C-alpha cells in the first residue's frame, strides 16, 4: 500500500475476515474492477447494472425454486454440471457450493472437450442430477448439448437446462445466485450445517 501511495498508483484494499463463499459479490466485483483496469475498461457501469438486478432478485429466486423443484426428490444425489467454456467457472463454483454447503458431490463436464466421455459414461440411468449451462455461442456445441440431453432424458435421467441467454457478466452472476440458493436448500433438505466447512473453519 505504501509503495503504491509513494508512486501515486491506484490500489485496492480488500477487507479481511470474510469467507469468500459469503461475499461472492464483493470478491467477484473487486476482481472485475481489477481486470477491467488492466484491460483499460471501466466496469463500474456494468457492476451497477448487476447491483440493480440484485435489488429485485425475485425472478432469480423464482428460477432457483424452479430448479429446486426439479431436483427436490433427488437432492441428495451427486450433481454433474455440463457446461460450455463460457460457463466453466460458474459450474465449478456451483460444485464447490454443493460440496461446502450441502456436503454433497459435484462434478463438471465441459463440452465439447468432454463430449465423448459424457456419451460413453452416461449410456444408462444414473443416480445423478444434471444441470446444463450453455451460453449458446457455438452452433456445434449447441448440437452436442441437444444430443446429450436427448440421450440422458431418454434413459430417465433428471436434467435441468438453465435458460441462460448469453455469456455476459450479468447472466453469470444470475446463475451463480440461483445455484447458490439451490445449494442452500439442498443443505436444508439434507439437514446439514451449511456454515460448517471443516477445511476452512
List where the protein language model places each region.
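C-terminal active-site/capping subdomain that shapes the small-molecule cofactor and substrate pocket
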Residues: 120, 125-197
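Short, charged, surface-exposed secondary-structure boundary motifs
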Residues: 20-26, 116-119, 171
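Short glycine/serine/threonine/alanine-rich loop segments
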Residues: 9, 103-104, 157, 192
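Glycine-rich phosphate-binding loops that contact phosphosugars or nucleotide phosphates
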Residues: 1-60, 72, 135-159
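Short beta->alpha junction loops
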Residues: 15-17, 111-112, 161-167
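Hydrophobic/aromatic beta-strand patches that form the interior of the parallel beta-sheet core
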Residues: 10-14, 80, 107, 129-133, ...
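Active-site phosphate/pyrophosphate-binding segments
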Residues: 36-129
Amino acid at each position: 500500500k505504501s509503495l503504491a501511495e509513494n508512486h501515486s498508483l491506484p490500489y485496492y484494499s480488500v477487507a479481511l475476515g470474510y469467507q469468500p463463499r459469503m461475499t461472492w459479490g464483493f470478491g467477484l466485483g473487486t476482481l472485475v474492477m481489477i481486470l477491467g483496469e488492466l484491460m483499460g475498461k471501466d466496469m463500474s457501469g456494468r457492476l451497477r447494472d448487476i447491483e440493480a438486478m440484485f435489488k429485485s432478485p425475485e425472478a432469480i429466486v423464482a428460477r432457483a425454486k424452479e430448479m429446486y423443484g426439479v431436483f427436490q426428490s433427488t437432492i441428495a444425489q451427486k450433481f454433474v454440471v455440463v457446461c460450455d467454456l463460457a460457463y466453466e467457472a460458474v459450474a465449478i463454483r456451483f460444485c464447490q457450493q454443493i460440496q461446502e454447503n450441502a456436503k454433497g458431490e459435484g462434478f463438471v463436464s465441459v463440452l465439447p472437450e468432454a463430449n465423448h466421455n459424457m456419451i460413453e459414461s452416461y449410456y444408462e440411468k444414473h443416480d445423478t442430477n444434471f444441470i446444463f449451462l450453455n451460453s449458446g455461442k457455438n452452433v456445434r456445441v449447441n448440437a452436442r448439448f441437444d444430443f446429450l440431453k436427448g440421450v440422458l432424458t431418454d434413459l430417465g435421467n433428471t436434467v435441468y437446462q438453465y435458460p441462460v441467454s448469453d455469456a455476459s457478466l450479468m447472466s453469470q452472476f444470475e446463475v451463480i445466485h440461483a445455484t447458490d440458493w439451490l445449494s442452500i436448500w439442498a443443505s436444508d433438505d439434507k439437514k446439514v450445517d451449511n456454515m460448517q466447512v471443516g477445511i476452512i473453519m
